UniProtKB/Swiss-Prot annotation:
Gene name per UniProt: feoB
Name of this protein: Fe(2+) transporter FeoB
GO-annotated cellular components: plasma membrane
Binding residues for GTP 3: 56-59
Residues bound to GTP 2: 35-39
Main location: membrane
Residues covered by the FeoB-type G domain: 3-169
UniProt-annotated location(s): Cell inner membrane
């Protein structure tokens, strides 16, 4: 079979991702475009005659980049197409918005690269009474047009057949430009490298006249002639870019008049009716908060019901199984404990997180595909404008509920460097899925019937602190107003199940692999460090270990937030949590249960793997049956506790060490707000600079320590009024000093602000193929 590379390109919300998932299934690979942290997805699929590599390009409305401060999506899409790597392009077009989508189509066809138009969302178009003559559209465009409903898989085989039959586009002169424009485009084309096809050279000439800044990198000596061409055009027309765009829109209008009835189409009545409620200025925000609470509720309920299968199953295989192997093969006791507690305990920490994190990713994917996520940005626009940000900046922040890394990377969709940087600084405060795992454990141990409210309050607190961080930046070092916010609101539709599953699987797989590697390594390290004293001797009591000795020296620093000296395990959890937040659970689980593992004698004669796995299945089935009872729906956290006794095990030790719910909640505030994990730090450094990464770390530590101290000292004021008063005053004075210093630093920071993405944008200013 012949190999074929195809670029998949289209407007945002045109169904491009759904089509990509339909064609490639699970055969996908996610990486980054060279030099930037913009996600690059590739997938594999086969037709009758070809083995195809499909490259999913960023969604874009146009290939024209007017400013270096614009979104990176247009830059990457344009440079990939011009690199010549793609043998064929599939342009996904939203049939219900034909006129707007055809602007990108015309640019692709003018470039002369073989192209297939995938006319998607025909079901939505039909509901809006839109009729399109597909054959007439194909004739007018001079390329194949394949009707699709990608959410249902309709038209996929026809698309594969069109790929096998692909040829060069018919040489149809689509757009009739003014003669002066053609003359100057030809003049510029003659000065370009003759190895490039004439059609592409003329296209580059028009792009240069339109003001596209990156086409000059491909124009060679022609770039030096641009000023001459513009000077000649100035005598004949006011604005060449306006004339070029007008000629394209006239062509689009002429095509639509012939092939469709878009002028008489009816907007979706369902979408209009729902938007009257969802976008209501008074109801919009409460509805958004309810949706976020519902996401948390489902993650805890359904994810918690599936947890016994992953928890008890991993204990049976990776802890008891390792102990049985060690006993059978006569391993030394210290080695068996080390492997069971380190390797087995690490795996046992990761796997129980899978169902709850997976349910949250599934819910987020549903919100994105259904069309609600765009509405959430619109609802938050008024609040974001108060911060000097457009509502569009809230979209990457919402993504932060899943993971802060794509949240930071999502800031690239914003146009102004100031807006990107402010969004990046706010992103780490959004409570990610790994933090949910920590909150759920503490809620079950300390808050009982109020567990759901406690966890939800932490989510809201994260949003509030992100907003306050934005206000602080706006009034100190990043003053300015938001750019105008224009955003397309797609019609509501039922997401495709296959697409939801694939998106959830990709995110969950990334989480498990990333978290698993870190947790297992940390668990093994902690197990070793917890088995020896500072003098190198093996210890029987973990309180005599080197880890305990070092941690006790550091723990007094956290006394103001409620971490007592004997609770050195909590201090270790904070340090390991800087690598990955989910490691906090693994650390506490390893340390709080270490004595139990050392003290409990293992009898290999009593170990039966099959019985333990069957027990895990039975517990899971019982949990699923109980999941939707009224008591569980009203109390998801309490239900997730299961049948475990608080007096024993990790939860019992943790309850004794913290001593009160106030101390535990204060600890959770610190975990929510302090330094982001290593992956997020790296993303911040790549998207901005190491300096801004350092600022984010220091600001997060200050906010976390200050807020946790204020909460704990206020709630426990009656126990030690003098100490509490000193702590509260110290926090207030310190933050007043910090804010005054930031206000004074504004003039110096403004100069450096515009350069924060210079290293990122420059990747697209080189020669062809530099962005792939």
């Amino acid at each position: 079979m012949k190999k074929l590379t195809i670029g998949l390109i289209g407007n945002p919300n045109s169904g491009k991702t759904t089509l990509f998932n339909q064609l490639t299934g699970a055969r996908q690979r996610v990486g980054n475009w060279a030099g930037v942290t913009v996600e690059r997805k590739e997938g594999q699929f086969a037709t009758t005659d070809h083995q195809v590599t499909l490259v999913d390009l960023p969604g874009t409305y146009s290939l024209t980049t007017i400013s270096s401060q614009t979104s990176l999506d247009e830059q990457i899409a344009c440079h990939y197409i011009l690199s010549g790597d793609a043998d064929l392009l599939i342009n996904v077009v939203d049939a219900s918005n034909l006129e707007r989508n055809l602007y990108l189509t015309l640019q692709l066809l003018e470039l002369g690269i073989p192209c297939i138009v995938a006319l998607n969302m025909l079901d939505i178009a039909e509901k809006q009474q839109v009729r399109i003559d597909v054959d007439a559209l194909s004739t007018r465009l001079g390329c194949p047009v394949v009707p699709l409903v990608s959410t249902r898989g309709r038209g996929i085989e026809a698309l594969k057949l069109a790929i096998d039959r692909h040829n060069a586009n018919d040489n149809v002169e689509l757009v009739h430009y003014a003669q002066p424009l053609l003359r100057e485009a030809g003049f510029l084309a003659d000065a370009m490298a003759q190895e490039m096809p004439l059609q592409q050279r003329r296209w580059l000439g028009l792009q240069m006249l339109e003001g596209d800044i990156y086409s000059r990198a491909y124009a060679g000596e022609a770039a030096q002639n641009l000023d001459t061409s513009l000077a000649r055009l100035k005598d004949e027309m006011d604005d060449p870019a306006l004339h070029i765009a007008d000629a394209r829109y006239q062509c689009i209008a002429a095509i639509c008049d012939v092939v469709s009835n878009t002028l008489t189409a009816e907007p979706s009545r369902f979408t209009r009716a729902v938007d009257k409620i969802i976008l209501n200025r008074f109801l919009g925000l409460p509805i958004f908060l309810f949706v976020m609470y519902l996401m948390f509720l489902l993650a805890i309920n359904i994810g918690g019901a599936l947890q016994p299968l992953f928890d008890a199953g991993s204990v049976a295989i990776f802890i008891h199984g390792i102990q049985w192997i060690g006993y059978t093969l006569h391993f030394p006791d210290w080695l068996t404990i080390f492997l069971a507690q380190g390797l087995g305990g690490g795996i046992n920490t990761v796997l129980p997180l899978v169902p709850q994190i997976g349910m949250m990713y599934l819910f987020l994917s549903f919100l994105e595909d259904s069309g609600y996520m765009a509405r959430a940005a619109f609802v938050m626009d008024r609040l974001m404008q108060a911060l000097g940000l457009p509502g569009k900046s809230f979209v990457p922040l919402i993504v932060g509920f899943g993971c802060n890394v794509p949240s930071v990377m999502g800031a690239r969709t914003l146009d102004a460097p100031r807006e990107r940087l402010m969004t990046i600084m706010m992103a780490p405060f959004m409570s990610c899925g790994a933090r949910l795992a920590i909150f759920a454990v503490f809620a079950a141990a300390f808050f009982g019937q109020n567990g759901a409210l406690a966890v939800f309050s932490l989510y809201v607190l994260g949003i509030v602190m992100a907003v306050l961080t934005g206000l602080m930046l706006k009034h100190t070092i990043m003053r300015g107003e938001a750019s105008p916010f224009v955003m397309e609101l797609p019609v509501y539709h039922v997401p495709h199940i296959k697409s939801l599953i694939i998106q959830t699987w990709q995110r969950l797989k990334g989480f498990v692999l990333r978290a698993g590697k870190v947790i297992i390594i940390v668990s093994i390290f902690l197990s070793a460090f917890n088995s020896f004293s500072l003098s190198g001797k093996i210890v029987d009591n973990i309180n005599d270990s080197a880890l305990a000795s070092v941690s006790r020296v550091i723990t007094p620093v956290f006394k103001p937030i409620g971490v007592h000296e004997d609770n050195w395990q909590a201090t270790v959890g904070l340090f390991t949590g800087a690598m990955a937040k989910e490691v906090v659970v693994g650390t506490l689980n390893t340390l709080y249960t270490a004595e139990n593992i050392q003290d409990e004698a293992f009898n290999p004669a009593d170990f039966h793997l099959g019985d333990e796995l069957l027990g895990a299945v039975d517990d899971t089935w019982q949990s699923l049956k109980d999941t939707f009872s009224l008591s569980v729906l009203a109390n998801p956290i309490e239900a997730s506790k299961g049948d475990g006794e608080m007096a024993t095990g990790a939860m019992g030790v943790m309850d004794q060490k913290f001593g009160s719910a106030a101390a535990a909640y204060s600890y959770l505030i610190f975990v929510l707000l302090y330094v982001p994990c290593i992956s997020v730090m790296g993303a911040i450094a790549r998207e901005s600079s190491r300096g801004w990464m350092g600022f984010s770390i220091l600001w997060g530590l200050n906010i976390a320590y200050s807020l946790a101290t204020l909460f704990y000292q206020v709630t426990s004021f009656s126990q030690h009024p003098t100490y509490s008063l000193i702590c509260i005053l110290a926090v207030i004075v310190f933050n007043v000093v910090v804010l005054s210093l930031l206000r004074r630093a504004r003039s110096r920071v403004d100069i450096e602000l515009l350069a924060t993405r210079k290293n990122v944008s420059s990747c697209c200013s080189g020669t062809a193929g530099n962005c792939h």
